[in-house]
Structures are given as C-alpha cells and as structure tokens.
Design a protein with these regions (language model features):
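Glycine-rich phosphate- or other oxyanion-binding loops that anchor nucleotides, phosphorylated ligands
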Residues: 11-181
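Extreme N-terminal starter segment of soluble prokaryotic enzymes
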Residues: 1-4
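Structural motif
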Residues: 6-10
Length: 182
C-alpha cells in the first residue's frame, strides 16, 4: 500500500524519519499543496493519505498531550445561516461532514486559531484536516487523520507543545505499517 504523510508545519513532525509533504497552515495552503502533489503523478496516486498535526481541544474529555484518530471533519468557519443553511454547512455543496469511519471524534477545521466560546459540535479543532479530507474524497484516496492535542485554545500552550507529538505519531505509523504487512 502506498502512503503519503501530510502535515502543515515542519515543527509538528520534527525528528520523524519519514518523507512528509509540508502544506503550510490553513485550508487553502493544504488544498493547494495536496492537489499539486496529486497532479504530479495523476495515474499513481497514493492508496492512503495520513494527516498528522496539532489540534486544540474543545472538551474536557480529551487530554493535552494525547494522540487521537479523527473520524469526522467539518468546516467550523463556514457560516451560511443567513441563506437558510445550517451552521458549518457549505452552501450548495452536498458534502457537509466528511466521515472515514475510523472514530466518532469530530474535527472542526477553520482558518483562524480557535478560542473557547461556547459548546461546539466538534471535540477538536485544526486548520487543515477538512480540506485534506475533501481533496482525498474527490480523488478516491483513503484518508486517515491523527491529531496531537496541543492545547485548549491557548496560543502560548500551542507554542509550547507543537513539537511534542511526533514521537507518538511515529509509533502510530509503525503500528499501521505492521498491520499492513499482516
């Protein structure tokens, strides 16, 4: 099985002994980088894209310093309610929630650093996962996503923890590769 690992920042994967596509921060950068990668070899797309990165938690049921697999993805900054659409629903797009069936954990992706406001429908927040999941869905490529919870909406906490999850992710990759050979 061919696999491509994708992350927003080199700081998130520092020390990882893998080839990683670094996309840059945000939905547009993530989309652009992965589409460009797919366009380079359109007849040899990877079987699997794995996104790894940091995420903020919106609930006390998750722990800063733990690695989680995400199974659902929404755009947390998509607001078309004035047009009669539901919160987080992209107007005139059939796909509002992308699910891979790997877990019930939902990631809200947006182009701003999330800060605690109110109860959300998602447990973690990031700035790239929904965009990457959408590109993979459009190309028929399996998508998995692992997020290291770095903070609870505190930018200083994120800065302190951004590089601490790569060892956990390296262990998860080893486990995935071992399962693949069975």
């Amino acid at each position: 099985m061919s696999m491509r690992i994708v992350s927003a920042l080199i700081d998130e994967v520092h020390g990882l002994e893998e080839s990683v596509l670094i996309t840059g921060v945000g939905k547009i950068n993530a989309t652009k980088a992965l589409e460009r990668e797919f366009a380079r070899s359109p007849f040899r797309l990877p079987d699997l894209v794995i996104n790894y990165g940091t995420a903020g938690k919106t609930t006390e049921s998750l722990n800063v310093g733990d690695l989680y697999e995400v199974g659902k993805f929404v755009q947390r900054d998509m607001m078309g309610t004035e047009l009669g659409f539901k919160e987080y629903e992209t107007p005139f797009d059939a796909t509002h929630v992308i699910e891979n069936g790997r877990s019930n954990l939902t990631c809200g992706t947006g182009d701003s650093f999330w800060t605690p406001k109110n109860k959300e429908i998602f447990e973690i927040v990031d700035m790239e996962a929904y965009a990457l999941a959408k590109v993979c869905q459009d190309h028929g490529v399996e998508f998995r996503c692992f997020k290291f919870v770095s903070d609870g909406g505190d930018p200083d906490e994120w800065k302190e923890n951004v590089g601490k999850g790569s060892v956990l992710f390296a262990n998860k990759l080893k486990q995935i590769r071992e399962e693949e050979t069975k």
